């Protein structure tokens, strides 16, 4: 790191500690030439996660949209807001950990459905009815039959 006082490029780290709830690191450094101390901050470069919509347009990932969809699916169900927040955080972390900068709405929908299926089957069916755009009662019933078959297998 270049010393802000003398411009020398060698220094030693005197102290290092996490800040901003672990999202950055504060370092105290000492220049090996002029012995003056200075502080630097390191932060992970966060690249925005882009969502590819069905019409091929792109927009930044929006966790509020995800949360609103879950709230609608879980309306009047015994699922706490806390549980939904954890699910949103988990899904967002899963998407970021995939190391892909772009993700499709299909991928997000499949992740949400797999998590809802284990949490609450009614919420799962509600979400699936919007996500899969059931055109009539038969496609809706097919999804219910599939869910019941999977339940029997388990």
Curated annotation (Swiss-Prot):
<dbReference type="Pfam" id="PF22811">
    <property type="entry name" value="Zn_ribbon_NrdR"/>
</dbReference>
<dbReference type="GO" id="GO:0005524">
    <property type="term" value="F:ATP binding"/>
</dbReference>
<keyword id="KW-0804">Transcription</keyword>
<dbReference type="GO" id="GO:0003677">
    <property type="term" value="F:DNA binding"/>
</dbReference>
<keyword id="KW-0678">Repressor</keyword>
<comment type="function">
    <text>Negatively regulates transcription of bacterial ribonucleotide reductase nrd genes and operons by binding to NrdR-boxes.</text>
</comment>
<feature type="zinc finger region">
    <location>
        <begin position="3"/>
        <end position="34"/>
    </location>
</feature>
<keyword id="KW-0805">Transcription regulation</keyword>
<feature type="domain" description="ATP-cone">
    <location>
        <begin position="49"/>
        <end position="139"/>
    </location>
</feature>
<keyword id="KW-0238">DNA-binding</keyword>
<keyword id="KW-0862">Zinc</keyword>
<keyword id="KW-0067">ATP-binding</keyword>
<keyword id="KW-0547">Nucleotide-binding</keyword>
<dbReference type="GO" id="GO:0008270">
    <property type="term" value="F:zinc ion binding"/>
</dbReference>
<dbReference type="Pfam" id="PF03477">
    <property type="entry name" value="ATP-cone"/>
</dbReference>
<protein>
    <recommendedName>
        <fullName>Transcriptional repressor NrdR</fullName>
    </recommendedName>
</protein>
<dbReference type="InterPro" id="IPR055173">
    <property type="entry name" value="NrdR-like_N"/>
</dbReference>
<keyword id="KW-0479">Metal-binding</keyword>
<comment type="similarity">
    <text>Belongs to the NrdR family.</text>
</comment>
<dbReference type="GO" id="GO:0045892">
    <property type="term" value="P:negative regulation of DNA-templated transcription"/>
</dbReference>
<dbReference type="InterPro" id="IPR005144">
    <property type="entry name" value="ATP-cone_dom"/>
</dbReference>
<keyword id="KW-0863">Zinc-finger</keyword>
<dbReference type="InterPro" id="IPR003796">
    <property type="entry name" value="RNR_NrdR-like"/>
</dbReference>
């Amino acid at each position: 790191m270049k010393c802000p006082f003398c411009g020398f490029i060698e220094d030693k780290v005197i102290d290092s500690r996490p800040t901003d709830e672990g999202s950055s690191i504060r370092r105290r450094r000492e220049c090996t030439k002029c012995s003056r101390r200075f502080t630097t901050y390191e932060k992970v470069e966060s690249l925005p996660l882009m969502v590819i919509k069905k019409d091929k347009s792109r927009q930044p990932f929006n966790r509020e949209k995800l949360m609103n969809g879950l709230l609608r699916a879980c309306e009047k169900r015994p699922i706490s807001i806390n549980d939904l927040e954890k699910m949103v955080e988990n899904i967002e972390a899963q998407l970021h950990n995939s190391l892909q900068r772009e993700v499709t709405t299909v991928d997000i929908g499949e992740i949400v459905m797999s998590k809802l299926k284990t949490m609450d089957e009614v919420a799962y069916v509600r979400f699936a009815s919007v996500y899969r755009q059931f055109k009539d009662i038969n496609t809706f019933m097919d999804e219910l039959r599939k869910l019941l078959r999977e339940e029997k297998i388990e």
